Amino acid sequence: MPLSHFSDLLTVSQLNIRVRDILEKNIGQIWLMAEISNFSQPSSGHWYFTLKDERTQVRCTMFRNNNRHIFFKVQNGLQVLVRACVSLYEPRGEYQLIVESMEPAGEGILRQKFEQLKKKLAAEGLFAEKYKKPLPDSVKQLGVITSISGAALFDILKVLQHRDPSLPVVIYPTKVQGEYAPSQIVKALSIANRRAECDLVILARGGGSLEDLSCFNDERVARAIFDSDLPIVSAIGHETDVSIADLVADLRASTPSAAAERVTRDRRDIIQKLGSHQQRMAMAMDYYFSKLRQRFVHLSHCIEQQHPQLELERQKMQLIHFKISMEKIIQAKLKGLIHQEAHLKKNVLRRAPQIQIYQYQKQIQEEFHQLKAAMERKIHHYVQRFAVVSSRLETVSPLATLARGYSVTCFSSGSMLKKIEQVQIGDELNTRLQGGWIKSQVLEIKKN
């Protein structure tokens, strides 16, 4: 049969490529637990080995950029948990695993459980930022959940002693490793929330293996942290260790020491802020008293301008000016009349009409008396008006009040004394009476 009749004829290379694509797409990434054998580590840095169980085996490759993250000794006979992709080595047509990560079998199981729980809780929203509680700006009392014999507590207290030695600390002791640790941590969280005596809680432990830290990857602990009414700061292991508790907590600190630094204030900052507040208060008080002094001067000036004595003086000056004006008018009128009389006498003497002279004299005398009486009435009217105004002003004058036997008492600062509650023993007082001032000191206070 001619080759042209085989439209789908493949080469070996094409076949291997198709098989590789099928393996990678249909199977993809897997988790596998097996024993290492035939382990080799050539100069290229890549690892080549076989994973086997009691009956079968599969070839594996782990490239250098992945195996450089492995920090345990890999050797034949070691049980491991690997994450790998199924593929095909085309030159030989052999299927193989491309290993991406590897852990000893014990830790591998824990890691697998960690990933499963992480995926579950993430789907429920326990890691969501919207549920994170904000930390208080100022911590008045700090709670710490940890082992009382662990290094984590020592590190936290050391930082507090340096930064804020006056901060009260409540320790909720618990196991942080082992079978009973999760239940004790949950109980400690419950006690802290029930007492509600702290502003926030640090959940802390020193570094360790994945198995050592497994209690912080427990679902019960994660849900207790999520349900806490108090903000929780996690400080578990080293910076590279990330636990489920870290993901659920309201804030993750890389170490217990870092957690203590994050939630406390440096006493040097506190002293600096207090100094700044004191300076601002002093400036505010200076400004306030300056305004009070300005207002006092202004009010004193207004009182002086409105004092009844000044009004009396103004009225008096008006009467004096009026009197002078009236005297000038009268003198001018009299001068005119005298001049007129002299002129008339001259005419009379020249003509000698005795009867007419007598009539003119009589008319002049009558007009003089009328003018004089009018002037006296006018002066009397203004004198009476002045007396009325003076009487009214005297009625409202503080001096008149003093004349009736009353007095006015004020502090040495000038402020008026109105109530007995203003006075304290030892205060110096100034009392205004009719005719002068009395300066006194308070020796005894009696209330009605």
UniProtKB/Swiss-Prot annotation:
Name of one Pfam family that matches: tRNA_anti_2
Keyword Cell membrane applies: no
Top-level taxon in the UniProt lineage: Bacteria
Enzyme class: hydrolase
Principal place of residence: cytoplasm
Gene Ontology cellular component list: cytoplasm; exodeoxyribonuclease VII complex
Localization, UniProt: Cytoplasm
A biological process from GO: DNA catabolic process
Keyword Cytoplasm annotated: yes
Cited InterPro entries: Exonuc_VII_L (IPR003753), Exonuc_VII_lsu_C (IPR020579), OB-fold_nuc-bd_dom (IPR025824)
Reactions that this protein is recorded to catalyse: Exonucleolytic cleavage in either 5'- to 3'- or 3'- to 5'-direction to yield nucleoside 5'-phosphates
Residues annotated as transmembrane: none
Keywords for the protein's UniProt record, in alphabetical order: Cytoplasm, Exonuclease, Hydrolase, Nuclease
Single GO MF descriptor: nucleic acid binding
The EC number(s) this enzyme carries: 3.1.11.6
Cleaved signal peptide residues: none
Record note on quaternary structure: Heterooligomer composed of large and small subunits.
The protein's role, per its UniProt record: Bidirectionally degrades single-stranded DNA into large acid-insoluble oligonucleotides, which are then degraded further into small acid-soluble oligonucleotides.
Family, similarity comment: Belongs to the XseA family.
Protein name: Exodeoxyribonuclease 7 large subunit
Lineage, broadest ranks: Bacteria, Pseudomonadati, Pseudomonadota, Gammaproteobacteria, Enterobacterales
Gene this protein is translated from: xseA
